[in-house]
Amino acid sequence: MIIATTEIQAINSFSRSESLSLKEVYGLIWLLVPIFTLILVIIIGVLVIVWLEREISAGIQQRIGPEYAGPLGILQALADGTKLLFKEDLLPSRGDISLFSLGPSIAVISTLLSYLVIPFGYHLVLADLSIGVFLWIAISSIAPIGLLMSGYGSNNKYSFSGGLRAAAQSISYEIPLTLCVLSISLLSNSSSTVDIVEAQSKYGFWGWNLWRQPIGFLVFLVSSLAECERLPFDLPEAEEELVAGYQTEYSGIKFGLFYVASYLNLLVSSLFVTVLYLGGWNLSIPYIFIPELFGKNKTGGIFGMTIGILITLAKAYLFLFISIATRWTLPRLRIDQLLNLGWKFLLPISLGNLLLTTSSQLVSL
């Protein structure tokens, strides 16, 4: 009897451990599926941005653009990435190899982490944190450290100058960007990205922060372009002055990682413009005409999720079009003009906007 009881207890404990292990496996799967789905969406989004930039720049310059790699040249970015993947990875003989190798990885990883707090639809966010927007600002401030490491580790005067410019530019425009985000948080009574979108949806189209914070929107727009180091703010990699800036000594896949980080940063900035100022996944305008169709993105379901994602991406790519058109139409600023714009104009304007927002919130109490 004792042996039988012992066997039964062993079988029961084994079945419990097996069920627990199955639950852990299922939990791990449900944790990894959204992450890999988000990474896949980000990769596709970056490929679309590269294709759009080439087509828009070709249209502005009155030329054809890519047309052989896939239909309408949409696979050209994959072809370029494959080429860089198989090119030789050269290392500077007198540089700091560890800093040289870590720099591109830090730039890419810090930008990827920013996507954790972006809501693509109702309940479609990996991490709905109470400090979501400030987490993005904190994470995005890590990327210039990677660029500075790349410039210093290259042991090249052009690379080091580019890294210093990247750090100075990031500090100059991070402060106005933070003040604009703080104004939005005060207006929405929350720092969660989901709560900010929900606060804008209460009043429909005219409740967007674009209309309630027009000054902050313009400052945020300019500051986000400067943070992405896009023309006319690409001083860290100015070809006429610094060859290629902090990228000068890089080749192969590490060289390609800088471009990946740049486009990832551009996409995440566009998504945050959508979330903070353009109502996120809420379309608002057609609610008057077809409320039963566009109201479903709040009730869940595959159809509602799809509608929310499409609305978010449509708004983000509208801002992307503006960014790409700006790059190919405006000349580059000088470094003194760049810093003066950040410290003497955008910083006082964003600070005044924050004071006005705080005053209006206190009066409304």
From Swiss-Prot:
Membrane topology qualifier: Multi-pass membrane protein
GO cellular component, one term: chloroplast thylakoid membrane
Main location class: plastid
Membrane-spanning residues: 29-49, 106-126, 129-149, 250-270, 302-322, 338-358
MF (Gene Ontology): NADH dehydrogenase activity; oxidoreductase activity, acting on NAD(P)H, quinone or similar compound as acceptor; quinone binding
Catalytic activity: a plastoquinone + NADH + (n+1) H(+)(in) = a plastoquinol + NAD(+) + n H(+)(out); a plastoquinone + NADPH + (n+1) H(+)(in) = a plastoquinol + NADP(+) + n H(+)(out)
InterPro entries, per the entry: NADH_UbQ_OxRdtase_su1/FPO, NADH_UbQ_OxRdtase_su1_CS
GO biological process: aerobic respiration; photosynthesis, light reaction
Domain of life per record: Eukaryota
EC number from the UniProt entry: 7.1.1.-
Binding partners and assembly: NDH is composed of at least 16 different subunits, 5 of which are encoded in the nucleus.
Cited PANTHER family: NADH DEHYDROGENASE SUBUNIT 1 (PTHR11432), NADH-UBIQUINONE OXIDOREDUCTASE CHAIN 1 (PTHR11432:SF3)
Function: NDH shuttles electrons from NAD(P)H:plastoquinone, via FMN and iron-sulfur (Fe-S) centers, to quinones in the photosynthetic chain and possibly in a chloroplast respiratory chain. The immediate electron acceptor for the enzyme in this species is believed to be plastoquinone. Couples the redox reaction to proton translocation, and thus conserves the redox energy in a proton gradient.
Family: Belongs to the complex I subunit 1 family.
Name used for this protein in its record: NAD(P)H-quinone oxidoreductase subunit 1, chloroplastic
Source organism: Acorus calamus (Sweet flag)
Highest classification ranks of the organism: Eukaryota, Viridiplantae, Streptophyta, Embryophyta, Tracheophyta
